[in-house]
């Protein structure tokens, strides 16, 4: 009987894990360069005043992220189509602008990564 309960629990647990991995999310926020924003080395590191610096950082390989409008949380941006380039190529035209992104959210070690499938300028 214990074996049956263990099997049922295991199947349910893995089914929930798989369902969560496939869940798409949509969020709105500003595209920022992760290094300047997190370190605070360049002050606030958001908005049009920081666009040139963030663009240069992204060209230099610093990853971009989304500063979520609702929560103020910072989410690392990634993509699945061309993973070797990260999301910088996809987001470079939107740096320091408000966007709405859709993708699959994954988390490991306290870091959230949004694997972006769609990005549009927010209204």
Name each model feature, range by range:
Residues 18-123:
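OB-fold and OB-like single-stranded nucleic-acid-recognition modules
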Residues 5-15:
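Bacterial N-terminal signal peptides
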């Amino acid at each position: 009987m214990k074996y049956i309960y263990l099997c049922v629990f295991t199947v349910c647990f893995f089914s929930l894990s798989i369902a969560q991995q496939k869940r798409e999310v949509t969020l709105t926020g500003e595209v920022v360069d992760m290094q300047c924003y997190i370190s605070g080395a360049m002050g606030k590191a958001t908005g049009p005043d920081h666009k040139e610096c963030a663009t240069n950082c992204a060209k230099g390989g610093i990853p971009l992220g989304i500063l979520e409008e609702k929560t103020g949380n910072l989410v690392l941006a990634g993509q699945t189509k061309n993973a070797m380039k990260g999301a910088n190529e996809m987001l470079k035209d939107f740096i320091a602008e408000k966007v709405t992104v859709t993708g699959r959210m994954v988390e490991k070690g306290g870091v959230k990564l949004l694997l972006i499938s769609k990005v549009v300028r927010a209204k």
